[in-house]
Amino acid sequence: RQSPSEMRSSNLAKVLARDKKLQQIASRINKVANDVEAVVMPAIVGMDSQEAVSFIRDRVQKPLHFIATMPPSVPGVRVQTLLRKYFANLGGVYMLGNRVTGGCIEDGRLRYVETSLLPDERLEASDFVLATGSFTSDGLKSNYECVYEPIFHLDVTAPADRMQWVSTSVFDDQPYLHYGVRVNALQQVQKEGHTISNLYAAGAVLGGHNAA
């Protein structure tokens, strides 16, 4: 061990990506797990695919289960990788590091968006999905006066009174965790009380969604 980062789950998963290493781990588990009903180990197997998980489960003689580790999450990275591949197979283009900075809303529709890495390009589409997350991913922001959605300045579910944003006890359910953009039954967002017909919201940016 040269540094603490070597013990991160993602680093361990890279080491355990080889069948030889997984076989060694399985053999050692089998030697000490004779009198147990099941084996539980950290989720540090299968960064890129499910194959490594299936490989070690087939070789451990007891039911093998995985529990989550501290971030980064190996299963989470795997799911993200698979979703990106599936998205690409459907014809999607993933622009790593690019951020939507704004757009043009006219006549109740989002006409195009502008991005940080393509400042001179307008990205047009018939429909758009807003999935920017909550406060931790900057999908929502706040200042001393209000909670707001920073890209299109959409309507949000937060009250104007700042004193209502938090509970006095840190152990209570915090109201701000439920804030998000206001949508209708079709998940279409609203701005100044008017529905944007081709802009939909999904995930933690939705009002009522508690990301915690």
PLM features per residue range, with description:
Residues 1-212:
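Residues forming the flavin
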